[in-house]
Amino acid sequence: MTQPNFKRVQKRNPHQLVVDQHVHAAHCIRKFADEKGTVAVFDKSISRWVQRKPDAAIFCAKRAWDQRSEKGYMISIETAFFNVIDNINTPLTERRYDDISRYYHLWRLRGVARDKERQNVHFNKVGGHRLTIDEQEILEKNGYSFILENDGLLHHLASGIEIQVMLAKICHDMGNIKWGLLTARRGEFLVADYYPGDSFGLEPFIPVSPKHAFFANTLDSGIDVHQVRELNRASISSSGNYFFCRTLEKCPF
């Protein structure tokens, strides 16, 4: 699986910048792990199933956004969502819909950022700074963005800002989504690497365990194996580089 070129860090990564960035959080992937701690992944680049741990490289983008984003607003959104899925039986009336929506859109925007062509942003009539690689990494480590004399605003710095702005806009424009919990009576859910939105004419949904998925603007309900199959097919169609599950034999598609 290849990704666009990315700005590499210094040898030995002295400032401990995150290079391998999860598109879908490892905590969420771990909900689908088997007794060995791995998930079954269909890797589209090689057209076959493989077993991978939740921290595997296949689940990560290569420095597609900056450290400020990775360790700042993204962590806050993830933590709130983890609280929701770790307490999956919370009643519908007490469910934190906004926390689900923010994570859903963050996940999607990170997937887009993973696949996007990497280009720096240049500004007319704006002078930049002459900074060594070490100075750049120190600034990024401390949450700063900067414009370089020749390279402008580096792609991953711009991407972190863009994701944050787009996230706020999307959440505002879409308004309040009420997420119902679907429980599979038979069969288990597959998960796409990310979901590109309503491109396939389906309401947003998020598989959160082999047996559970949040589905936009519906009530909590149990679903049969045919409905599970329909959602799994949507996950496969939505996927870009891979899709995964706990046990292939239990996933109708």
PLM features per residue range, with description:
Residues M1-D20, H24-F253:
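Alpha-helical structural context detector biased toward long hydrophobic helices
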